[in-house]
Amino acid sequence: MTRFRPCIDLHEGHVKQIVGGTLSDLGSGLITNFESDKPAEFYASLYRRDRLTGGHVICLGPGNDDAARRALAAYPGGLQIGGGINAGNAPDWLEAGASHVIVTSWLFSADGQFLPERLAALVEAVGRERLVIDLSCRRTPDGGWTVCMNRWQTFTNLPLTPATLSRLAGSCAEFLVHAADVEGKCRGMDETLLPFLADHSPIPVTYAGGARSLADLQLADNLTGGRVDVTVGSALDIFGGMGVPYADLVIWNHRDPSLSSV
């Protein structure tokens, strides 16, 4: 069944919820839905208490390492870490308590060309079983998707296709896919992308972007046959949202899987 995957998004050392498509190097045009007065480790401890697994900490730009390390220390082995990951620092993040490292931008050249030798270096450094590839994407005019990097600012040369998923699945444990065009907007999920991922990903995959209610988790479960997990961010009450009580998602995750619609 589709599970809720918790998140901790860090920007300038603070827990925030940001409209994904507004991130930029200059910071101009940034739309922030929520900035917490609580530290990252508060949320990590909450997820640990409620036995929520497979969540992630994402560092959006510089200045987040200390906050990320505190979160990982609060829930050792319970959270993945992404943002600025490369073959050099990935082992250190695992040592700091991350269950997996999540990588996107480092797999590409500055102009967005996929570099398979870097993926091989990461697999060598941490092992396939500790690696998550972030294939966060944006829509293209032809109705498909292209993987984006640099906080979703730069389109790469890697289309999100069945062949891409099949090709990369042998080098990682999971995929993480933010639908950047709807991320942080609480206006609904990409209902075409969800079943596409379910049909074509040979390994576990987590979708993020636009989930706004508990009904959206049920919708994802229906659309994917329970094969894709979902992250809920800006709609959560613990992140200032009004669409989804966190307590309801804890109950959802711990319910009898036989009750799931498949």
Model feature map: region roles:
Residues 115-120, 157-162, 187-195, 245-249:
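Charged helix-capping and loop-helix junction motifs
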Residues 11, 15-26, 94-182:
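Conserved anion-binding
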Residues 25, 36, 40-94:
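N-terminal active-site wall of soluble small-molecule enzyme domains
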Residues 51-67, 105-113, 177-186:
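Glycine-rich, proline-tolerant flexible connector loops at the mouths of alpha/beta enzymes
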